[in-house]
Amino acid sequence: MLQKPRGTRDFLPDEMERRRLIERRMRDAARRWGYREVCTPDFEHLELFTMKSGEGIIQEMYVFEDKGGRKMTLRPEVTAAVLRMYVNEGKVLPKPLRWCYFADCFRYERPQKGRYRQFWQFGVELIGADTASADAEVIMLADDTLRSTGVTFDLHVGHLAPMKHLLSGLDPGDQRAIMAYLDKHDQKGLEAVLFGKNLTHLAEPLAALGECRTVSEVFEVAGDVPERARIEETFTLLESQEIDYRPDFGIARGLDYYTGMVFEGFAKNLGAENQILGGGTYRLAHLFGGDDVASCGFAIGFDRVMVSIGDFELAHEPVVGVVCTPEGRARALEVARAFREAGVRAEADLMQRGMGAQVSHAAKTADFAAVLGKREVEAGTVTLKNLHSGEQQERSLEEAIAEVARHGAC
C-alpha cells in the first residue's frame, strides 16, 4: 500500500476546518491593517534563493531540472519570491506596498514535531517605507495576528545595530560567523570562534547585550549607535500601544539581508522547537535587479501555531440529511437545493438505501432528517426529525428551513 511521502501530512475534514478557521483569522487581521494578499509560484528558479542565502541552502531544498535544462526548486520560503514579484511587476505601484500571503513551502530536513518537509507560512511584507513607524506597524501587526489565533506567546523585539556596532571593524566574514553562532545560541561555537580570532574581549559585551532589558541599557553597552534615535522611536511607539513584548538585543537573525529591527515570537506551551514567528527589516530587491528599497516583514509558522493551539471545538453548522422513497428522489433533490440556497448544509442519499437505512446513516452524519414519504411528496411538505432529541413534526418546506436555520452555528 502506498504511503504519503515522509515529512508530509494528510488532513481529514475536521482538521482542515480548524486550519481554515485559523488561516482566516490571520488573513482578517492583515486585512484590517490594509494588507492585500498576493500569490507566487510554488516553484522558482534555483538562483532566486542561492543569491539570497548562498549555495549551502541547496542541500535543504527540493531541487530539480526541468525539461529545458533549467535548475528549479520548490520554494523553501516566500519572502524572496515576493520581492522578485515586486521587482518584476510591482515597482510602479504606489508605495508603501502592504502585501500578505499564505503559502506552503518545502524543505528537505529531518521531520519532527511541528517541523515538516511541506509546511505552511503566513507572512507580511511592507515594501517601500523606511521609518520607525513602518517597523512598529509590522511588529504590531505580527502581535495582532498571533493574538487572533488564540495562541499564547512571548514576543521578543531587538535591533541589529548595537550588535553590529560592537562588531564593526571586523572582517565581514568574521561578523557573519559570530552572528550565526549568536543566532543559534551556540555558546561553545561562539567561544571557539572568538578564541580562534583573538576576539575574546568581545565575549563580555556580547553577553551583556543579550541581557539588556531596556533601550538605555543597550547603549550603555554598545556605545553611541547611529541608529539610536530610530530604535528609541520604534520602542516608544510599541509602548504607546501597550504591546506586550520583551526587548531582546541578543537576537542575531542569521539571514544576511536583515538590516535593522528584528523580532521573534515563541509559543509558551511548546518545547525546544517553540519559535512561531520571525521577522525584521531588510533590503533584498536589489539582488534581483530592482532598486535598493527598504522592506519589513515577518513569517508565522502556521503548523507550529496549530500544534500550540491543539484540538478545539469548532462552531457546528447543522446538517440536514434528506430521506426519501425511490419515487421521491426528484423531490428530494428539490428539497436539498432549497436548504442549500438558504445557506444550510444538506445531503441527499446517493446509495439507493431504504428509508430506514437512510435515517440510520443520517443519524451518523447529520443533525436533522428531512423525511419525504409518499404523503409528504403529495402534500408538498417534509417531516423534520431532530436526530439528537428524536422530536419530529410535519412542516412546510419553508418552516423546516427556518427551524434548522434557527439552530444556526453553535
From Swiss-Prot:
The keyword Chaperone does not apply. One of its GO terms (biological process) is histidyl-tRNA aminoacylation. One of its GO terms (molecular function) is histidine-tRNA ligase activity. This is Histidine--tRNA ligase. Disulfide bonds: none annotated. It catalyses: tRNA(His) + L-histidine + ATP = L-histidyl-tRNA(His) + AMP + diphosphate + H(+). Gene3D superfamilies: Anticodon-binding domain, Bira Bifunctional Protein, Domain 2. Belongs to the class-II aminoacyl-tRNA synthetase family. It comes from the Archaea. HAMAP family: His_tRNA_synth. It is found in: Cytoplasm. The lineage of its organism: Archaea, Methanobacteriati, Methanobacteriota, Stenosarchaea group, Methanomicrobia. InterPro entries: aa-tRNA-synth_II, aa-tRNA-synth_II/BPL/LPL, Anticodon-bd, Anticodon-bd_dom_sf, His-tRNA-ligase, HisRS-like_core, HisRS/HisZ, HisRS_anticodon. Its EC number is 6.1.1.21. Signal peptide: none annotated.
